[in-house]
Regions:
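S-adenosyl-L-methionine
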Residues: 1-63, 71-78, 100-127
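Conserved beta-strand/loop positions that form the S-adenosyl-L-methionine
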Residues: 65, 88
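Conserved glycine-rich SAM-binding loop
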Residues: 68
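Short beta-strand element of Class I
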Residues: 83-86
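Conserved SAM/SAH-binding beta-strand->alpha-helix loop
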Residues: 91
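A short glycine-rich, Lys/Arg-flanked "PGG" loop and its adjoining helix->strand segment in the class I
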Residues: 152-166
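Conserved beta-strand signature within the Rossmann-like core of class I S-adenosyl-L-methionine
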Residues: 167-174
């Protein structure tokens, strides 16, 4: 496979691999007829999302909170086609990147939406309705004036726990030791 040039407006052909800053984006570009539509352009009225209706099947569900450009979720959706993935971020621009990439790879087991983690779990996920929650990496807000903006508060950790199925798992990654200790303290409460 040829490495595509990434000039402005460069379009990738089927079979090509997309690169970002020299790093391959997971998956191979599919022919246009195999592309999917992964964007949830508007959230429904608040209430538990029926995952089976959204994805058209019964499958385990993983939510990626703060998905950014979707690199992790793309890889997970490709590696685990038997799982359904729901990726969210508050920034429309990065969600558009992820959506385009998932569409071009024909990933019917992935959806993207612009929404924050608290609202998603509180307003759209029922108790014990999710198998996995991924957060890579959460914004640490190290400035003492901004600490109150942290998402991973004890209340949010409790909300995640309530939304997980009995054998569900939470995955959190941070490169900030002090923030990791803060998260662990929240879990212990």
């Amino acid at each position: 496979m040829n490495r595509p040039s990434r000039g402005a407006g460069a379009e990738l052909a089927p079979g090509q691999i997309e690169y970002e800053f020299g790093i391959p984006i997971p998956g191979v570009i599919q022919p246009r007829e195999a592309w999917t539509k992964t964007a949830l352009k508007q959230m429904p009225a608040p209430g538990a999302i029926h995952w089976e209706a959204l994805f058209g099947r019964v499958a385990p569900v993983a939510i990626d909170i703060g998905c950014g450009n979707g690199r992790f979720t793309l890889a997970s959706a490709l590696e685990r086609p038997e799982w359904d993935h729901f990726a969210i971020d508050t920034l429309p621009a990065v969600v558009r990147y992820g959506t385009r990439r998932a569409n071009q790879r024909g990933l019917a087991n992935l959806r993207f939406a612009v929404i924050d983690g608290w609202r998603m779990l509180n307003d759209y996920c029922g108790d014990q309705s999710v198998d996995e929650i991924h957060i890579y990496p959460p914004q640490p807000y190290c400035d003492p004036k901004k600490v109150s903006r942290r998402m991973l508060t004890p209340d949010f950790l409790l909300l995640m726990h309530r939304r997980l199925k009995s054998q569900g798992r939470i995955f959190i990654q941070t490169d900030r030791p002090a923030y990791w200790e803060y998260i662990q303290d929240g879990v212990r409460r």
